[in-house]
């Protein structure tokens, strides 16, 4: 999907997307919701230091919207530097079969939680395109984890999380897409 607004084709009843980056002791987060009535995609961007405290103070939290796939600030100001070239993973990368052919399946990291119906499957892979999205060297070893919910799957309520971590650095992100 090139534009965030194109998600309405897959999720006509609306959607929410969270994209969270962790690096250099900083959390950068983009949260948006797609309104099915107006077809507008609005949300917030947040920057805050990663601390081991209950109430992490946000350096800033600002309202955003998307127009033709581009992030815009609700107040008309410039998009902060760390979000200037922001694209969701689903806009930038598609997990094709060839990715899984070349990835190493990590059986120890496969899990199903009976009490919650949550599951995840982890892979280790080297993928230049995904490394570029994570802004690490192209030959970096990546841990890629897919998460979902069996009960939601059975009820045709779509929720997927992709979690990517560069193994040799402390840089990671996750993206969650949820159908409303």
Language model features: what each stretch is:
Residues 1-26:
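N-terminal leader/targeting segments and the immediate start of mature chains
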Residues 5-6, 29-36, 143-152:
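Extended lipid/amphipathic-ligand handling interfaces
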Residues 12-18, 40-42, 115-122, 157-160:
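Short, hydrophobic/aromatic-rich segments at coil-to-beta transitions
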Residues 19-27, 45-53, 163-170:
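Short, flexible beta-strand-to-coil junctions
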Residues 25, 102-105, 139-143:
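Short solvent-exposed loop/turn micro-motifs enriched in small/polar/acidic residues
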Residues 29-88:
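An acidic-aromatic
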Residues 80-115, 128-131:
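Extended amphipathic alpha-helical interaction segments
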Residues 119-180:
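Gly/Pro-enriched, hydrophobic low-complexity segments
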């Amino acid at each position: 999907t090139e534009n965030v607004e194109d998600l309405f084709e897959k999720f006509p009843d609306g959607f929410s997307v969270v994209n969270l980056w962790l690096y250099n002791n900083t959390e950068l987060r983009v949260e948006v919701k797609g309104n099915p009535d107006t077809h507008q995609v609005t949300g917030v961007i947040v920057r805050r230091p990663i601390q081991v405290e209950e109430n992490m103070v946000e350096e800033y939290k600002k309202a955003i919207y998307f127009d033709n796939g581009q992030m815009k600030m609700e107040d008309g100001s410039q998009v902060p530097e760390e979000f200037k070239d922001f694209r969701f993973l689903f806009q930038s990368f598609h997990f094709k079969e060839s990715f899984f052919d070349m990835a190493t399946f990590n059986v120890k990291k496969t899990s199903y939680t009976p009490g919650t119906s949550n599951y995840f499957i982890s892979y280790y892979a080297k993928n230049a395109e995904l490394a570029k999205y994570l802004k690490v060297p192209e030959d970096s070893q990546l841990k890629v984890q897919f998460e979902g919910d069996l009960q939601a799957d059975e009820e045709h309520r779509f929720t997927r999380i992709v979690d990517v971590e560069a193994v040799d650095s402390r840089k990671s992100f996750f993206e969650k897409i949820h159908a409303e």
